[in-house]
Amino acid sequence: MHKALALVAFTALAFPLILIGQTSNVALPQDKGPNKIDVSTYPAAQQQGYKVFTEKCAKCHTIARPINTSMTKEEWERYVKRMMHKPNSGISDSQGKTIFEFVAYDQANRKDKNPSAFFKSLSDEEIEKLKAAQH
């Protein structure tokens, strides 16, 4: 009973704080959110960035995951670099730069205007606990 309560408490606290880029076999709350956004009002470079973003990022996880996650510019830079170095990501340096520029623009122009609608990132340790709880 105590273990179950601890798990419920952890889940409730962790729910709004999510990290993208984990393996696709881990279900995260933001995976259930919208899986696309309307970028028709974004500058042409960002519309092209969205295409690269959806093509490359969908190889390893849902597109909903990064669309529904909110991070600082520095966190986005770190996580895009991290994803670039994952085996079989197929993300070149120029594509990584394009993806980063898109997610940074999207963060500033969509997410930062409504921060309570998006999930924050978790630490690696918190993600491991979440993975363990799902198995």
Residue map of PLM features:
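Flexible coil segments in periplasmic/lumen-exposed cytochrome c-class electron-transfer proteins
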Residues: N25-A44, S94-H135
